[in-house]
Amino acid sequence: MKILKKINDFLFPLNCLGCGVKDTFLCDSCFRKLTRLEDFCPFCLMPSLYGATCRHCQKKHSLDGAFVALNYSQPLVKKLIKKTKYQPYLFPLLSNLTEALTEKIKKSNFLKNPGKFILLPIPLTSKKNAQRGYNQTEIIAEKLKNDLGLLLDLKTLKKQKETRAQSQLNLRERRKNVNDCFKITREVKGKNFILVDDLITSGSTLDEAAKVLKMKGAYKVWAFVLGRNLESK
């Protein structure tokens, strides 16, 4: 067992990805240095309470608002979120990053009645999930469920077709890319949902998920997201 542990420690060293200190993927000092974001409309970026979609953008979008914790434009935030997408041994780091999100939500007093909301992590297609072996948004959602006392649903929202990476596309292409990529498999009429994702850029993916939920009768659809890429909208 000691030999296996040494091999594991060699292959996957437990060092802070910010400063290199041992025994953690993200030390307290580097966690405090992560750039937090203020609340703003997820589409036009105008300041808004709780990150609610502003009146103007409500006319064109289905998502009611988005809590976003971290600024993805900060190199360290970008590095951490990118690594958690494809390296499952960094699961503990996802928990660390989600702490920044839970802190913001708790301070806001947004969840006065957590039992009214159901968490829906943005899904992968079955093929992509099998290839990767995990979905990082489900891990984030599990942490939020435990920290905030929310319900978690992994079956209602499904991704039915593969899409290109949104980061490679312009705004019009992003909207077209995610069009009709989600389907609803259970009754959602009158229910309130919170979508969970690791990153938002234009908001097209979250808005598409909100659209299909509301087409089936969902009442409110918000989003909880780790980071926002402010360099590309």
Locate each region found by the language model.
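Glycine-rich phosphate/pyrophosphate-handling loop used in enzymes and phosphotransfer proteins
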Residues: 1-196, 201-233
